[in-house]
C-alpha cells in the first residue's frame, strides 16, 4: 500500500514549513494587535515560538491533537495513507517533547482534527491502478477517542484530571466564546456531561465505533484505555449510555451561538 512512499509525504511536510508559517502568523498578529489561534501544532520548535509570544504578552491560543502527542512517523510507514495527516506525524523525540508544553500551559486545548473519509477515498489509485498516498486525502477519525486517549496517556505523564478537563472542555468553550453556557458544571449552564468509568479498561476496536468512517480508523487499533465513557448527557438528556446511542435523540443538537464581547 505504497508504504515506501508513505515517508515521502512526511518528508515533504517537514517541521520547518510549520515553524515558518507560525512565525509569520505571530508577527502579523503582533503588528496589528490581533488575537491568533494556532491549530494542530505538531513540532516543539513551533510550540516554543508560541510560548515565547505568550510570555511577551501576545494573545495566542494553541491547539494540538492526540495523534501529535502519541504517534510518530513510523505509523505512516506501517499504515500508509491511513496515518496521513496535515501537519504530518513527527519524529518520536518531537512527539514526547510536546507533552512539556501541555504541562506548562502553552497548549490551551486539545482538538481531534476528526477527518472522516471513505475507504475508497483513502485508497486512491494512480493512473496505473496502484494505491498512491499522495492522492489520498489527509486525516483520519478521532473525535470519539480524544477523551480516553488523553485521560490514559495524560495520567501516565503526570497530567492531572483537572488539567485534562481544562484541555478538553473548559478552554475550548472559552476560546469560542460559549463559556459559561458550555464547559462548566454550574447553575445556568447547559446540562452537558460525560460520565467516565475510571475502573473500566477498554481495548480500542474500530468496529465498536459509531463513526461512519470506522473503516479507515486504523492507527489506534488495539490500544488499551484505562477508562471508558459510560454515558453522555446533552442539555440534560442522556443520548448515550452503556454502549448504546439513543437514536431517538437525533436532531436534539442545537446551534451554539458565541457571545460577542
Model-derived segments and their meaning:
Residues 124-132, 190-255:
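C-terminal cap of metal-dependent C-N hydrolases
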Residues 37-52, 85-99, 175-178:
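Active-site glycine- and acidic-residue-rich loops that bind
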Residues 32, 53-56:
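Helix C-cap/helix->beta junction micro-motif
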Residues 1-11:
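Single conserved hydrophobic/aromatic residue that forms the stacking wall/gate
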Residues 38, 61, 111, 195:
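Generic enzyme active-site microenvironment
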